[in-house]
Amino acid sequence: MPSDWADGYKYDKNETEASPIIVKNTLVDYAAMVKREGGKSKVSNVLVIDMDAIKNSLGIVPTPQSMDVAFVVSKSSEYENGSNKSIKLTKKYILADFKFNVTSPDKVYKNISNDDIKGKFDFSISYIRGKDINIPCCNIAYFIFNDTNYQQIRNRWSRRNLNSPKSRAVKQSDFEVIF
């Protein structure tokens, strides 16, 4: 996946930190979240919404699956309205799940199923839509893998047909260009 996976969108600090989906103690440091999930990141001063903490705070039994993080991205585009030029700001939530524990292509089969992807994405997107009607969700769930062995993992991901229109494997270094 080239580094243009985000289509010109960039992390929106203000919108993320003001998101109505946040509940107590769910706005967390991105690098700390990556570390908790078994990875390492040099990204600093970036806060994301911990979807696992939100899910756990709801007290739903059985506990549903969720994506690991959500955050808001935005991009501005210039357009002409008659003789006037205007700027349009577009925003959306990104949902990502860290898969740093998948260290070899064979583990793609053991650690990720289509049902897992669907369950994580469906719960997370329905929660966000229920709390924030002003900013839409991206319709793609991003699964973030370590840069090591990424090509082999991505090939297995594609052959397993996990790279559906609703999910996409992205290597960590490409994912982090959004910040």
Predicted regions and their residues:
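Short, charge-rich binding segments
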Residues: 60, 84-89, 132-134
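Generic alpha-helical scaffold signal
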Residues: 63-64, 90, 115-118
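Catalytic cores of nucleic-acid endonucleases
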Residues: 101-152
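Conserved catalytic cores of phosphodiester-cleaving nucleases, focusing on short active-site segments
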Residues: 69-71, 92-103, 124
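Active-site beta-strand-loop-beta-strand hairpin of nuclease catalytic cores
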Residues: 72-95
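Domain-level recognition of nuclease-like catalytic cores that cleave nucleotide substrates
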Residues: 133-179
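Acidic-basic catalytic patches of nuclease active cores, encompassing PD-(D/E)XK
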Residues: 1-65, 73-78
